[in-house]
Regions:
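Structured alpha-helical segments in the cores of large, soluble enzyme domains
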Residues: 83-88
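C-terminal non-catalytic interaction/localization modules
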Residues: 1-59, 67-78, 89-92, 106-132, ...
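Short beta-strands and strand-loop turn motifs
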Residues: 99-100, 175
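A short beta-strand-to-loop transition that corresponds to the Sensor-1 phosphate-sensing loop
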Residues: 63, 100-103, 135-138
Length: 316
């Protein structure tokens, strides 16, 4: 008797592109929660298993990447942490990432930003080596009746979508998650599994080892997510330091200024050191670090000027 073949899949993509519905179609049952808006639904990772022909299919539904996530520190870090969990939860690794997008919607630069975000999490070559592009809303394609097969339609695409097709080596499939026609359900699932099996036969999986190779880019991504908040907090502290520096310059007797300047220099140094720690040698906070260093230089210049003035007075 032939042993069953394991296939491990991770669903990824933009929020509300039908990832959970696709997962249910692959599993042939309602296992994943499917909503029109999943912004708060799929921040975690869930998985279910089913049998199909001689395959045991394990489907993981990853967190959705919404447009707001790309600009929001908290959401961005949540997604990264959830993706890390998806990798550690399945130590055997994944045969394929199913990158889910909708047929019928224009693939924009924002969508490309989502792909870029995912590449910074999983590695620059993960699309090329492990991704299958799945277009949901297959029923919409058929209703348009444009006289083209799906393959012909793909060949006509231009711009960022064409670039994505080329990057994933034209591993693309159309899915209708709404159909009740059993033959159609079986055909699209069979086509997908055949595509995944070709990846499986290479003997490769995306594992934690692949994930660790992308760690540097992922750390920089997380630091960049914090940059707006770190910048705001830093500029607030710098403003207070410079305000106190100006007050000291105008109101404190020359012979007493040094202790005030030393206190301010220590504050500036603490601020600089704290930002360096948060930067984690990624360079993401370079501009903020440079600004803070300039404040230290300004205070050091004031100390030098103060010392010169005191020395000149002592000569008199």
């Amino acid at each position: 008797m032939e042993l069953p073949i394991d296939i491990d899949l991770l669903l990824i993509g933009k929020t509300s592109n039908g990832r959970s519905a696709l997962g249910n179609t692959i599993l042939r049952r309602k296992a994943f929660l499917s909503k029109s808006s999943q912004e708060s639904v799929t921040k975690k990772v869930d998985y279910h298993v089913s049998n199909f022909n001689n395959f045991v299919i394990k489907v993981f539904d990853g967190p959705g990447v919404g447009y707001t996530c790309l600009d929001d520190e908290h959401s961005k870090i949540l997604v990264i942490k959830a993706m890390e969990f998806a990798i550690t939860t399945n130590p055997r690794g994944y045969h394929a990432f199913l990158l889910v997008t909708e047929y019928g919607g224009r693939f924009t630069d924002k969508d490309q930003d989502t792909v870029t975000f995912l590449k910074r999490i999983f590695g620059e070559n993960f699309v090329k080596n492990f991704c299958i592009l799945v277009l949901t809303n297959g029923d919409r394609f058929e209703s348009e009746d444009n006289g083209l097969t799906f393959g012909e339609w793909c060949k006509e695409q231009t711009g960022v979508f064409k670039e994505l097709l080329e990057e994933c080596c034209h591993r693309v499939i159309l899915f209708d998650n709404r159909t009740e026609v059993e033959a159609k359900k079986m055909k699209q699932l069979t086509d997908l599994i055949e595509m995944v099996d070709k990846l499986r036969l290479r003997g490769l999986r995306y594992t934690d080892e692949n994930f660790q190779k992308a760690r540097e880019a992922r750390e920089k991504l997380m630091v960049e997510a914090k940059e707006p908040r770190v910048c705001e907090e830093t500029m607030y502290e710098i403003s207070l330091i410079l305000q106190k520096l100006q007050w000291t310059h105008e109101n404190v007797d020359q012979k007493d200024k040094r202790s005030y300047f030393d206190d301010l220099q220590q504050r500036a140094k603490n601020l600089y050191d704290n930002i360096q720690v948060q930067d984690k040698e990624t360079g993401a906070l370079h501009d903020i670090i440079h600004t803070t260093k300039s404040v230290q230089v300004t205070i050091a210049d004031e100390i030098k000027i103060s010392q010169i003035v005191i020395q000149e007075r002592e000569k008199e």
